[in-house]
């Protein structure tokens, strides 16, 4: 779908990494976009109020309902007038489903699924950076579409694949190749990782992201989730999706075609590029991000993934082959384990070990009916996965 020349936009997760960069892109093209609503968790109330004032939005929603009074005060302080303020998860879902031309979903975690579904059902084009929507509830998400091609992927890897797929038909695709920077511990062996601290893991060599995504990038669980997302978004089986380590993070992913040609998308690492395309596709905008400087000598390297040191990708592949419920448990248990690690309650190697243990516990009960019937069923399964992860973490 071609986005209207002056599109209404709602930003979910506006104070996070995706949201702030999305607003930066929009600020450079005021003639193309009008931001009508912002939603955020509630951890950065002053920033949310400043965004509302800068973009003259009509509505702001906050997940944490207790932050509504503080947000109202911050809006007054920022000089934002006539802004409707709502609170609680239902208010964010309602905003997402209000019928904007584009909804940019930069929420972290599976709580982003219901807003994604609401946006699709309302006919909005969904610029999707919330990979958990696809990982935990892909069937529910895709069945909510009211037309074809309603989802614009915003993850840099999936945006790269999306762009590269324009070079051929689906039948001509031999494989997808997802690139990984390797994270801060590239080249480390498993034995070297026992004493990794949150502070070390939060230092990513390439990308500036939120804490959960940064930890996922260090364990390469993020890459595992991206393999799941790529398979479901582009209808390619997992055995035809490779992962290669590319430390320079210039080639963001590739598509290999049946004739031997490989098409890639290359650019210096800057999330504003895939965000901008997610907002404006199929059109491209000027003044978004820097291009590669082809006048300078450069070396791009690619190396195989060390599955022994980073078992998360293989674990994700196993879940993808098993069922949607397995991938939902993978995601929920991982979120719980990452939070425990960030709070110094779980050692670094315990993150993926905990996820695997939860999956082992729940495997038999997940195999009966592989698809969720509704979001409530998914939420209940995730709660059980989180509970089991907590039990294992508390025994550490």
UniProtKB/Swiss-Prot annotation:
Reactions catalysed, as given in the entry: 2-C-methyl-D-erythritol 4-phosphate + NADP(+) = 1-deoxy-D-xylulose 5-phosphate + NADPH + H(+)
GO MF annotation, one: NADPH binding
Binding site for Mn(2+): 155, 157, 226
Domain of life where this protein originates: Bacteria
Pfam families listed in its UniProt record: DXP_redisom_C (PF08436), DXP_reductoisom (PF02670), DXPR_C (PF13288)
GO biological process: isopentenyl diphosphate biosynthetic process, methylerythritol 4-phosphate pathway involved in terpenoid biosynthetic process
Names of the cofactor(s): Mg(2+); Mn(2+)
EC number: 1.1.1.267
Annotated residues for binding of 1-deoxy-D-xylulose 5-phosphate: 131, 156-157, 181, 204, 217, 222-223, 226
UniProt entry keywords in alphabetical sequence: Isoprene biosynthesis, Manganese, Metal-binding, NADP, Oxidoreductase
Pathways involved: Isoprenoid biosynthesis; isopentenyl diphosphate biosynthesis via DXP pathway; isopentenyl diphosphate from 1-deoxy-D-xylulose 5-phosphate: step 1/6
Residues reported to bind NADPH: 15-18, 41, 130, 132, 210
Regions annotated as coiled coil: none
Known function: Catalyzes the NADPH-dependent rearrangement and reduction of 1-deoxy-D-xylulose-5-phosphate (DXP) to 2-C-methyl-D-erythritol 4-phosphate (MEP).
Protein family (similarity comment): Belongs to the DXR family.
UniProt-recorded name of the protein: 1-deoxy-D-xylulose 5-phosphate reductoisomerase
């Amino acid at each position: 779908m071609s986005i209207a020349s002056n599109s209404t936009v709602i930003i979910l997760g506006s104070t996070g990494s995706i949201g702030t960069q999305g607003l930066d892109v929009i600020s450079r093209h005021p003639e193309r976009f009008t931001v009508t609503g912002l939603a955020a968790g509630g951890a950065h109330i002053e920033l949310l109020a400043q965004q509302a004032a800068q973009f003259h939005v009509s509505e702001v929603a906050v997940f944490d309902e207790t932050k509504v009074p503080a947000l109202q005060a911050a809006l007054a302080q920022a000089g934002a007038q006539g802004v409707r303020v709502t609170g609680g998860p239902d208010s964010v879902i309602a905003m997402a489903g209000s019928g904007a031309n584009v909804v940019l979903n930069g929420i972290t975690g599976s709580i982003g699924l219901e807003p994604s579904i609401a946006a699709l059902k309302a006919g909005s084009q969904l610029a999707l950076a919330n990979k958990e929507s696809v990982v935990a509830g892909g069937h529910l998400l895709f069945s909510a579409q009211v037309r074809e091609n309603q989802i614009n992927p915003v993850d840099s890897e999936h945006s790269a694949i999306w762009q590269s797929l324009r070079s051929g038909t689906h039948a001509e695709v031999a494989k997808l190749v997802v690139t990984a920077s390797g994270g801060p511990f590239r080249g480390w062996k498993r034995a070297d990782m026992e004493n990794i601290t949150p502070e070390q893991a939060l230092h990513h060599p390439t990308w500036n992201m939120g804490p959960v995504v940064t930890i996922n990038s260090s364990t390469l669980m993020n890459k595992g989730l991206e393999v799941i997302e790529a398979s479901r978004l582009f209808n390619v089986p997992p055995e035809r999706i490779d992962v290669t380590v590319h430390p320079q993070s210039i080639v963001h992913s590739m598509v290999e075609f049946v004739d031997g040609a490989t098409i890639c998308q290359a650019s210096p690492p800057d999330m504003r590029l895939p965000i901008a395309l997610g907002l404006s596709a199929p059109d491209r905008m000027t003044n978004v991000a820097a291009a590669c400087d082809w006048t300078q000598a450069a070396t791009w390297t690619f190396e195989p993934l060390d599955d022994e040191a980073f078992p998360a990708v293989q674990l994700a592949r196993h879940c993808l082959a098993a069922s949607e419920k397995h991938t939902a448990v993978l995601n929920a248990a991982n979120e719980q384990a990452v939070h425990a690690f960030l709070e110094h309650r779980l050692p670094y190697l315990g993150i993926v070990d905990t996820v695997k243990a939860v999956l082992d516990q729940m495997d038999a009960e997940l195999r009966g009916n592989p698809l969720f019937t509704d979001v409530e069923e998914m939420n209940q399964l995730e709660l059980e996965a989180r509970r089991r992860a907590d039990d294992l973490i508390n025994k550490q």
